[in-house]
């Protein structure tokens, strides 16, 4: 394929009884895209090592090749436009189990029909991408308001349990919000940390779970003050449990200082 575009939809696409296995990185996913277009096949499934399970289908390991990944990524903007490039890149952060297959199906359609494909929101191969984006945007909006920090030896630390991998999307907000602080946000679900220290931010993948130290006495006092403040704001006669659940779903409560006690 040295003299060809990395994505060439000219030949007829076929469903293949094969499972792609890749390393879970975005570059690795781009190599899955390359393989799918090179073989003109839609795999039965696309797995990462964490999602690998027993199957009767042959498993094809897709190694991460940085040169191939760059070629595929460059073709997104060159042939499909910036909007498609942004949507695919953002949706890769989704927590949907079949996100890779959804994205590849869309890309085959987009390269066949052109840059306007992303506008066809009602198309069955396009609609799921906007559903993934909506889920991402909703979680980002919620966590921008629901992240609760505790001080640990001069550093602020927070724990979150998002369904989607949203740390890259939270980075700009919290770095701008606390430019002079050192802080970390620990994503338990995806075993990753957003670390901001000495005015520099980095995303770290963890090899094993992280345990934050317990808050000291001063921090515990501040937390108790915050809980008391939250309680004094409530007007019991106007309590609307359904409305509260809508604006602050229960799955967020375990990581929120003022809500933890209500889970007991």
Which residue ranges define each predicted feature?
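Conserved aromatic-histidine-acidic binding/catalytic patches
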Residues: 18-25, 60, 124, 155-166, ...
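Charged, alpha-helical interface segments at or near domain boundaries
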Residues: 47-141
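Internal, well-folded beta-alpha domain core
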Residues: 116-206
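N-terminal ordered "arm"
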Residues: 2-66
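Acidic, Ser/Thr-rich peripheral helices and adjacent loops at domain boundaries
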Residues: 63-72, 200-212
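Long, compositionally biased intrinsically disordered terminal regions
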Residues: 180-182, 192-198, 210-264
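Short coil/turn segments at secondary-structure boundaries
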Residues: 87-91, 188, 239-245
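Short, hydrophobic/amphipathic alpha-helical patches that form generic packing surfaces
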Residues: 28-39, 105-112, 172-176, 224-231
């Amino acid at each position: 394929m040295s003299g060809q575009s990395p994505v060439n939809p000219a030949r007829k696409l076929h469903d293949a009884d094969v499972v792609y296995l890749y390393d879970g990185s975005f570059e690795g996913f781009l190599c899955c895209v390359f393989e799918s277009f090179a073989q003109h096949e839609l795999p039965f499934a696309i797995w990462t090592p964490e999602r690998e399970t027993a199957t009767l289908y042959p498993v094809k390991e897709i190694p991460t090749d940085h040169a191939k990944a760059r070629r595929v990524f460059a073709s997104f903007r060159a042939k499909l436009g910036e909007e498609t490039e942004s949507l695919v890149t953002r949706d890769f952060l989704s927590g949907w189990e079949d996100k890779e297959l959804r994205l590849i199906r869309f890309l085959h359609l987009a390269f066949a029909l052109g840059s306007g494909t992303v506008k066809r929101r009602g198309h069955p191969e396009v609609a799921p991408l906007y559903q993934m984006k909506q889920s991402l945007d909703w979680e980002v909006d919620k966590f921008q308001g629901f992240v609760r920090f505790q001080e640990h030896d001069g550093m602020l630390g927070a724990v979150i349990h998002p369904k989607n991998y949203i740390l890259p999307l939270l980075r700009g907000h919290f770095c701008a919000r606390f430019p002079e602080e050192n802080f970390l946000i620990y994503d338990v679900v995806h075993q990753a940390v957003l670390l901001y220290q000495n005015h520099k931010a980095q995303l770290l993948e963890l090899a094993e779970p992280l345990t934050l130290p317990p808050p000291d006495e001063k921090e515990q006092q501040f937390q108790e003050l915050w809980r008391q403040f939250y309680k004094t704001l409530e007007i019991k006669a106007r309590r609307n449990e359904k409305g509260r659940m809508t604006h602050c779903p229960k799955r967020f409560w375990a990581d929120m200082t003022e809500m933890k006690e209500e889970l007991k």
